Amino acid sequence: MKRITWLSSADAPDWFPDPESALDEPPGLLAAGGDLTPQRLLAAYRRGIFPWYSPGQPVLWWSPDPREVLFPAEFRRSRSLDKAMRNRGVTVTFDCDFAAVVDACAAPRDAAGGTWITPEMRAAYVALHALELAHSVEARRDGELIGGLYGVALGGIFFGESMFARARDASKIALAVLVENCAARDIHLIDCQLASAHL
């Protein structure tokens, strides 16, 4: 029977168990504990591992298989998205307001008011952004932030963390512009981590 590994503060920040040892149920759960230092986060991403947990839980580390990925070279916009990008008056920028994008992604989206982006998680990704390793894409209309996403770029891969939309198709437009700019940024794969009907 597989069991998750507990990471302690005594463990080297770049040590993780083999992703092959991740649980089947819940799918991909690999380890618990540790911290969200840049060193540990980067070590995790290099092995296809990411943190995802709720307030009150220890840091939970995941490596699901299969996982959702996009190949920018194979990306084709749908007609409806192409029309939305032409007609909605949306301007897309990169790394212009990282903290605002994370805060918008962290805003509760359901009646229960839950979010997985804890203050510690926010601080960790802001620290990665300061190191120019975490990046945001902002979609604005008339200067107002209406959608966007953020993630980590490492080794030719963009690891998408979260996205939000305050207007129809705004996050999809941000994602499409990211994908279309991947070649210029030396990104060959986008790891969406978990399958989503939104993509």
Where do the language-model regions lie?
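N-acyltransferase acceptor-side catalytic subdomain
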Residues: 1-198
